[in-house]
Design a protein with these regions (language model features):
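Surface loop/turn signatures of beta-propeller and other carbohydrate-active proteins
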Residues: 1-11, 39-79, 115-148, 176-207, ...
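Hydrophobic core segments of beta-strands in well-ordered, beta-rich domains
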Residues: 3-24, 32, 44-47, 63-101, ...
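Short active-site-adjacent helix-start/loop capping segments
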Residues: 25-28, 56
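Phosphate-binding glycine-rich loops and adjacent basic patches that engage nucleotide phosphates
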Residues: 28-31, 107-109, 130-133, 165-168, ...
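Beta-propeller blade signature
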Residues: 31-38, 104-114, 168-174, 227-234, ...
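Glycine/small-residue-rich hydrophobic helix-like segments
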Residues: 215-226, 230-241
Length: 297
């Protein structure tokens, strides 16, 4: 199955690239595909495979928290080089043999070409074993989202206490050493009966004219739904209680159970937003879906 799409561009290459994960019953590996039109994707190959046995990323590697040149919502998703390398934070798991076997970790990867990735640090950047790990995240750390703003790096990540997931924030001055924000979680769960009652996860943050917007997924009301939150300071967020897109929105049934884990791109050719997401149907089949802000041919 496939999951966790993230679309980006690399200087000197035409078109777009997308990383995603493939699950082979043992764990996650990250793959990359190419597209000229944001609809048809081909040239699939491995981007980053399993880490060494006994280490924090042996059971799974989930690329997608890239260092971009610009985080404006309409900017090209162009990767930014730092000292000759592109960088991505990544989610990881230490054990093979199943789906997201806890506890999860986060690492940092680097690449010279944006296609093939390797570890940039041999220890995790976030772990449940670190001294500043909070109660809300004590059981598992999941997927990061990297943002650079005014010389600082922000990592919006989801984590779990039991079966409850929320979004927290870690900060860094160099990409390699991170400290958690003292008032985590920054996007907590909603009240009973809300669309994010159980999960507020997988935040993707962009600048939109005069404020920041986070696209995340909530779990509640018998499904996973694409939701949004807003802030001006990156710390204090206001959640829109009504989903942007609800599970079951596609009449084919491909997202009848979950619609989550988005990647957003503005296509100037047709002046439309393209939002990729992980679609899960009623029997658990996973794949990558696409919704757009305007009809496309």
């Amino acid at each position: 199955m496939t999951d966790v799409p993230t679309v980006f561009q690399v200087k000197g290459r035409d078109g777009w690239l997308m990383t995603y994960i493939g699950f082979d019953s043992q764990g996650y590996q990250s793959f990359v595909a190419e597209s000229k039109d944001l609809v048809q994707w081909d040239k699939h190959r491995l981007a980053m495979g399993y880490g060494p046995e006994g280490e924090f990323d042996h059971g799974g590697v989930v690329l997608g928290a890239y260092l971009y040149k610009d985080y404006d919502i309409k900017a090209p998703r162009m990767l930014k080089k730092k000292k000759g390398y592109y960088y991505s934070l990544y989610g990881s798991y230490p054990r093979q043999g199943g789906y997201e076997l806890r506890p999860g970790y986060e690492g940092i990867a680097m690449s010279k070409d944006g296609i093939t990735w390797e570890r940039a640090k041999n220890e995790p950047i976030l772990s449940v074993h670190q001294e500043d790990c909070g109660t809300w995240e004590k059981d598992c750390i999941y997927q990061p989202w990297l943002l650079e703003h005014k010389g600082r790096y922000y990592n919006f990540y989801n984590a779990a206490n039991g079966h409850i997931e929320q979004t927290g924030l870690a900060l860094s001055d160099n990409l390699f050493e991170w400290s958690r924000y003292i008032n985590n979680p920054v996007i907590p769960n909603g009240p009973e009966g809300s669309f994010n009652e159980k999960f507020s996860s997988d935040s993707k943050v962009f600048w939109d004219k005069d404020h920041w917007v986070s696209f995340f997924f909530g779990v509640g009301q018998k499904g996973a739904h694409i939701m949004v939150a807003f802030t001006r300071d990156l710390y204090n967020w206001t959640v829109d209680p009504e989903p942007l897109y609800k599970a079951g929105g596609n009449p084919s049934g491909i997202d009848g159970r979950y619609a989550h884990k988005i990647s957003l791109v503005w296509n100037p050719a047709d002046e439309s937003y393209y939002m990729y997401y992980c679609a899960v149907d009623s029997i658990g089949t996973r794949g990558i879906g696409l919704i757009t802000s305007e009809p496309i041919n």
